[in-house]
């Protein structure tokens, strides 16, 4: 009995060792995660009015690579949304001349604006759109390695001289402005789509100001 007690006692430090080690590792990991999150709070985009805003906790255990991947996606979606807003407004006020599809007897002037256009585009036209998007994804929208997320100037930048002439502070300000505009555009194009589906009146500001317009 005595020998059994001695055996258990001698094993006890070994049993405590891994537990103590794991606790230290967890503490270190938590500190590391907290420090990483604090570094994200000073990144471009963590700005007024929301500051650092991560309601889904996507950055809780993220490293720098994960953050830059998310930022890359955000920048790209923001640019697409800004183009979508510009396209929506352009299509509302002007149309290309001529035919969109001779086989379908469909002119550009006959095309509705907004989401409704998807139901009118011939299959061949949709195939061209998706093919072009695929080409951009695979061959054009490639981030310059070692540069900031969203730098797609692999094929050269015609504005390189003016960009390089800017100070680091000015470049950071320009990138922050683009992020804010992209975020606003994502909310804007979503609002246009929602209001189009609700009552076919997407331009809420026009409605508030009493400015009439014909949509589709």
From Swiss-Prot:
SUPFAM superfamilies (alphabetical): Chlorophyll a-b binding protein
Record key words, sorted: Chlorophyll, Chloroplast, Chromophore, Light-harvesting polypeptide, Membrane, Photosynthesis, Photosystem II, Plastid, Thylakoid, Transit peptide, Transmembrane, Transmembrane helix
Gene Ontology terms, MF aspect: chlorophyll binding
Cellular component aspect of the GO annotation: chloroplast thylakoid membrane; light-harvesting complex; photosystem II
Topological relation to the membrane, as annotated: Multi-pass membrane protein
Database matches in Pfam families: Chloroa_b-bind (PF00504)
Keyword Membrane: yes
InterPro entries: Chloro_AB-bd_pln, Chloroa_b-bind
Transit peptide: 1-38
Induction: Levels are increased twofold when transferred from high intensity to low intensity blue or white light.
Transmembrane spans: 80-100, 121-141, 182-202
A GO biological process held by the record: photosynthesis, light harvesting
Family: Belongs to the fucoxanthin chlorophyll protein family.
Annotated function: The light-harvesting complex (LHC) functions as a light receptor, it captures and delivers excitation energy to photosystems with which it is closely associated. Energy is transferred from the carotenoid and chlorophyll C (or B) to chlorophyll A and the photosynthetic reaction centers where it is used to synthesize ATP and reducing power.
Subunit note: The LHC complex of chromophytic algae is composed of fucoxanthin, chlorophyll A and C bound non-covalently by fucoxanthin chlorophyll proteins (FCPs). The ratio of pigments in this LHC is; fucoxanthin: chlorophyll C: chlorophyll A; (0.6-1): (0.1-0.3): (1).
Name of the protein described by the UniProt record: Fucoxanthin-chlorophyll a-c binding protein C, chloroplastic
